[in-house]
Amino acid sequence: ERALGDISEAERDYYLERRYPAFGNLTPRDIASRAARTEIEAGRGVGPLKNSVYLDFRDAISRLGRAVIAERYGNLFEMYRDATGEDPYEEPMRIAPGAHFTMGGLWCDFNQMTSVPGLFVGGEAGNNYHGANRLGANSLLSACVDGWFTLPLAIPNYLAGLAGQPLLDVDAPEATEALDDVRGRIDHLVNNPGHTRPATFHRRLGEILYAGCGVSRSEEGLKRALEQVQELREEFWRDVRVTGTDDRLNQELEKAGRVADFLELAELMITDALDRQESCKAHF
């Protein structure tokens, strides 16, 4: 309830240093995220909503100098200052665990092809480099390797092996069925007489996943989240409202399509999490 300046040094709990003295605040990010979540859930959160912890750069600035910190984190500090009106060079930042993106991804072979012949996967959507949880600051590795080296060679090599083979006719039943399915989905989204914008469903889905399928999970929480996602998915298709038409660029329609995919992905993520009984990287 007090301002930061009113909290004495003796009262401040440097919980990472306390829990992991060998690593301190250099603990791996999944461990640091779980520790922050634990502190917040225990009622020790800070800020107006009591849903964050402090990240104090004073020692780093004192040791390395403001110029070095600005070179490394300047853009981040500017975004934080614009969002909060607080200067992270002068006072600690308020941070909390949040969804980044799905880690790991589709199984693929050495040539980046999935179990579906002809379907390739690149970047962090695959599983070849990082496994279930990559190291910090390594996100571009898979994108660069796949984009510059693997896929430009693997895909032409695969296509060369198809030379002379008949392609699927555009009027084949499989193609017609797939096209009709997509058109039907778009038609439903555009003409559905609902009342709720896609962004609202997106936010509610995030809240469900953050609470039940976040950095720390339990069987009870996952089952509750699965039920909530299924209910939200039904509500989405019943009450979503997309403004505009489908005969020109429509960002609301694009967003609705993505939210529909997110709802399906969320259900799969939770189902998979329930099937895994042991901790594994981002699943804890």
Language model: regions and residue ranges:
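C-terminal catalytic lobe of FAD-dependent flavoproteins
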Residues: 3, 11-103, 116
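Glycine- and aromatic-enriched mobile tails/lids
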Residues: 2-4, 9-26, 31, 35, ...
